[in-house]
From Swiss-Prot:
Location(s) in or outside the cell: Cell inner membrane
Keyword Membrane applies: yes
Chief subcellular location: membrane
Signals that turn on the gene: The mdtABC operon is transcriptionally activated by BaeR.
Transmembrane stretches, start-end: 3-23, 333-353, 360-380, 387-407, 431-451, 463-483, 528-548, 853-873, 875-895, 897-917, 953-973, 984-1004
Descriptive protein name: Multidrug resistance protein MdtC
Amino acid sequence: MKFFALFIYRPVATILLSVAITLCGILGFRMLPVAPLPQVDFPVIMVSASLPGASPETMASSVATPLERSLGRIAGVSEMTSSSSLGSTRIILQFDFDRDINGAARDVQAAINAAQSLLPSGMPSRPTYRKANPSDAPIMILTLTSDTYSQGELYDFASTQLAPTISQIDGVGDVDVGGSSLPAVRVGLNPQALFNQGVSLDDVRTAISNANVRKPQGALEDDTHRWQIQTNDELKTAAEYQPLIIHYNNGGAVRLGDVATVTDSVQDVRNAGMTNAKPAILLMIRKLPEANIIQTVDSIRARLPELQSTIPAAIDLQIAQDRSPTIRASLEEVEQTLVISVALVILVVFLFLRSGRATIIPAVAVPVSLIGTFAAMYLCGFSLNNLSLMALTIATGFVVDDAIVVLENIARHLEAGMKPLQAALQGTREVGFTVLSMSLSLVAVFLPLLLMGGLPGRLLREFAVTLSVAIGISLLVSLTLTPMMCGWMLKASKPREQKRLRGFGRMLVALQQGYGKSLKWVLNHTRLVGAVLLGTIALNIWLYISIPKTFFPEQDTGVLMGGIQADQSISFQAMRGKLQDFMKIIRDEPAVDNVTGFTGGSRVNSGMMFITLKPRGERSETAQQIIDRLRKKLAKEPGANLFLMAVQDIRVGGRQANASYQYTLLSDDLAALREWEPKIRKKLATLPELADVNSDQEDNGAEMNLIYDRDTMARLGIDVQAANSLLNNAFGQRQISTIYQPMNQYKVVMEVDPRYTQDISALEKMFVINNEGKAIPLSYFAKWQPANAPLSVNHQGLSAASTISFNLPTGKSLSDASAAIDRAMTQLGVPSTVRGSFAGTAQVFQETMNSQVILIIAAIATVYIVLGILYESYVHPLTILSTLPSAGVGALLALELFNAPFSLIALIGIMLLIGIVKKNAIMMVDFALEAQRHGNLTPQEAIFQACLLRFRPIMMTTLAALFGALPLVLSGGDGSELRQPLGITIVGGLVMSQLLTLYTTPVVYLFFDRLRLRFSRKPKQAVTE
């Protein structure tokens, strides 16, 4: 009593307290960062190593395995995968959430150092690492194009000047430059000319290496001067290399230009990048795991003018893709939804109270509670994201509930003739415990979410804390500011209502009277109501089991990512043509704004494409609908597949897959894995629950297997090293020398001119100089035959692995797909030597599925404990919790009606309903207990009176919560696919619970009262409890 009086009779102090809360919230709002979702990125580090010319199997056994054994000892590694292809190995380390990325990076470097002695001596450089997830979509893509400069020169500008500068920007984790390679002098040898001159490829290599030398020459010095010695020992351009004498034949000089074509070109000609059908260099920028995407993008944009000033005017630097506009648009949509929710909630209050003066009170309480929450969000290190803003939107209905309960009770006393200040004090005292019970029990719902681990726990923590803080501030405001404003603003008379609102008042009275009559009938037919309640419980269980489930709603971020997978024996020239063909098909799509792509490198048969769609306001279809239409057109392209998927804000794992979800096969028996993977993949491809089924196992690449005749080699004076050196010199794009320039280092690359390697007959033109100086053709001591060979070798942990990726067809959920995969694996009878498990997002979904029911039960148990403590009763909490089954049925039926799968967002809605719908029962039970204690009423009379007296606030609070969530259901635009499942769940649950709990709660109350009387020794205890 004194607590309430302290604020009611000191209006200045109460107003200033509310102003302080509001100002703190405004300050916090201005400092809060912006993000699409809470920070849920796993710390990921990528280790890269190269050994030019080495086969995938050689890279896996000699490079990947030693590194994996060393890296696997690092603490906190939750997953380690590797992929070895021609000349390169990449190892992805995913760490636990609580692992500091910088500390992990130090451990990675130490592990690399420890494994260095076990690595091949021919590696051109030590393994390196990057603090970025290669499977993440870039947050920004920059392109360089020019009509003047070559691709190699553009790549040089990008890698030498732009990439290092961008990498230094806060939040940037990795800048991957693609589309070409560094400039180089390429020596294309003519094998016939070499044979005619008696010059071996090793002779050419040695001559070039010896002619381009950078060594210190020392200095000359006398008594007064010092001269640094400088020579022309370096060759820098193709023109300088052409006249180089490499051999003397019969006294005549054989120059390099006589036996080779020397050009200024690039290190690796098997790379191509394009933007909108124009050759381009791509800078793909990825953020650090802990970085904020909006702040990082803004920082990059702020540096762009400076970057443009460092490159020639003839080079065009453009932003091809930027993830931030759709994120900003999505958050603007949520903010608009929040404003609409506030307006609708205040409108509900006005319609019920029919007084502008009374409506002002909750109209003040709601903004104070919501704005004050921003200060707590800032102190907790949160961000303004879709989930935290959705929490505030839903909180609109909650925070007004407290004010409504207090205001409505005070207004009831005023209408009875009580003076305003007395009515404020008396009304607040009567419902203070009710408001406290409603708020604490609602916050209790979120305690299991706060204790939940893993990615779901991190994802939902900001939502739960934000909503809990808003409810806490609302509780304070409703017990301080609201009664003070009621006492000083409201008058002791019935509200003067406008004529147009009298109809609503009469309708409300008629509705209350009708409810009273129906309630009397229900209280005389309690068994029927009990059967209905039991039926809702059973229906809940059936609906939950049968409803399709997924991890997170599929987002339309306006960005698509595509992986190209072609025949494993395809040439680079043909692959570049496929890239161009796919880009043309996509550019013809009206909804596409920009498309970039690249191919080449160590895996010639693969490529990547990044597609930016037009803003949602400029297209009528969702990203998934566009993918479905493009899928049919792309399927007509022979010899290659382009698998498209919408970029999501949540992606788990470090695998670079061509689809959204993965299923990984593991085995310690590589032969068994290679036998069963194609069978499993083909089986999964036939399932209607899956689309775009593909695999990273590529073991059917074309290989030419050379078989040496060692006896013949010994007789001819040739050793294996000389023969292998010949092949590397001829076909391996061998880097034989280094050209040093002020800004970078470039290579001299030697190979047989591609004009002479168009078919297998090129091997017949190769020869080795033996120990007697004679040219011995390769065909004299070797035979060759075509064979199959892997293009890549993949590991997970220390086991051989193969990952099958898939997307979901329209209308299918992740639960449908996972169940279908489990059935297929059982039908195939896969041996125990091959183990299958879901990976990435699909794995998190499986883990979440296992904990959902436990989470809901824990929330209900927590609410029961809190209510039991507040009411000092084992029974009354059960009465209050009896409202939940009807809400669950309504929520699940609504999801089914809208064809929305049960996702993590829908789970939030279920958890919220646990807190919302019990408010009705709390108001009924509180007033019924009060009537029994002080009104000497029977339990049936007490609960009947409580239901009628609290009918108006129950309707007000329910409609306020419903209208607060309704904009989420009706919202469109960016991010609506995240908001709608939450709104659908809440609105469906509220409608169903409102229809049933007005009748089931009094019946359950009387049932437990009779039960308590039956087992009680003192019947009066039922009244006094």
